[in-house]
Amino acid sequence: MLELVEYLIDAYRSRIQQLEWMSEPTKQRALEKLAQFNAKIGYPEKWRSYDGLEFGEDLVENVRRGAAFEHDYQLSKIGKASDRQEWVSSPQTVNAFYNPVVNDITFPAAILQPPFFDPDADAAENFGAIGAVIGHEIGHGFDDQGSRYDGLGNLNSWWTDEDRANFEQLTAKLVGQFNGLVPSVLEGTKTKGVNGEFTLGENIGDLGGLGIAVVAYKKYLDDNGLE
């Protein structure tokens, strides 16, 4: 899995360097951010402490206590540096995540099984499955929202104005492509269809992730003398 992540990051590095619409200063900052990505795989090395949280026999009261405990926990983070070791999900979650405020990608243990990942499967299967997911999550670091955070997770405008304008001009085409699309099961209903602007980040992640997984797989083949 670590090897897959490295191949995907390397593929993104090459793709960024090849961008024709992005200026060199922004490319360098993008490469710096990419180098600062932190990958969390399987389960946390440090488990969160729930000391002080006590439960009784009243379900409603337990829910209230849990909510209050979490509220206080989140407030306690104010004014402190972000903990890059903290996980945003449990290992039992079948999903993957990009967290812009710490610039990390997370792949819980539950998603590291077929059909997404199988250590005994052919490399093509893993690059096409979990590889596309890895690419999707890395892509969130450079989409319409994640691109507004730097490599340390700070909300920081690191793009030139011209590059941002070029990005928005290009992604407007993707917004237009998805606008109004209606799933076949909803055709004939009153649904308004997809909001291309609202789903832009996910669409960038899906399309970019799959494409970059192919690039990474080709490099894997070259590195191992395969065809």
Give the ranges of each region predicted by the language model:
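Intrinsically disordered, low-complexity linker/terminal regions across diverse proteins
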Residues: M1-E137, G141-E227
